[in-house]
Amino acid sequence: MAKRVLVVEDNELNLKLFCDLLRAHGYAAEPVRDGREAVARARDVAPELIIMDIQMPHVTGYELILELKADEALKAIPVMAVTAYAGREDEERIRGAGADAYVSKPISLARFMEAVRGLE
């Protein structure tokens, strides 16, 4: 059975790219367009990995990571942050919130998949 990956991204083009890339590599990608739905969807889908943008309207990926890691049922799920924030301080802050991997935009498809595989 394919590993389930929840992809939380408000940009439709990036969401499609990430989901298509994951599916092409044998993963079952579940898209979420609004960060406000991410925790409920994670409970429903029970993914093996959550990939999320950090810059989103309504709720940031940073806030979502904190919420996921505070939830007993979800805290063990690895989180990969995808962000335009490329500074060392940004990465430390995001990892400090609980992200298990960090990939900066613009995305290298090979690097993206390498980070995904590194969380298996």
Regions picked out by a protein language model, each given a short descriptive name:
Residues I107-V116:
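C-terminal output helix
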Residues V45-I51:
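Active-site beta3 strand of CheY-like receiver
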Residues M56:
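Receiver (REC) domain active-site loop signature in two-component systems and cognate sites
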Residues K16-A24:
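Charged docking surfaces used in two-component/phosphorelay signaling
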Residues E9:
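Conserved acidic carboxylate
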Residues G26-R33, R41:
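Short hydrophobic/Thr-rich beta-strand motif most characteristic of the beta2 strand and flanking loop
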